Amino acid sequence: MKVRPSVKKMCEHCKVVRRKGRVMIICSANPKHKQRQG
């Protein structure tokens, strides 16, 4: 899980989701792409 000030999709499998007011990226193909804004 990367924590970044700005999150971007890193590949076509990445999805933007909002959980508890936080913007997160989840990726089914590459778990390294998981990110959270904060």
Swiss-Prot record:
GO molecular function terms noted in the UniProt entry: structural constituent of ribosome
Gene Ontology cellular component list: cytoplasm; ribonucleoprotein complex; ribosome
Keyword Lipid metabolism belongs to the record: no
One Pfam assignment: Ribosomal_L36
The keyword Ribosomal protein appears for this protein: yes
Keyword tags: Ribonucleoprotein, Ribosomal protein
Designated name of the protein: Large ribosomal subunit protein bL36
Upper lineage: Bacteria, Bacillati, Bacillota, Bacilli, Lactobacillales
InterPro entries membership: Ribosomal_bL36, Ribosomal_bL36_sp
Organism domain of life: Bacteria
One GO-annotated biological process of the protein: translation
Family to which this protein belongs: Belongs to the bacterial ribosomal protein bL36 family.
NCBIfam families tied to this protein: rpmJ_bact (TIGR01022)
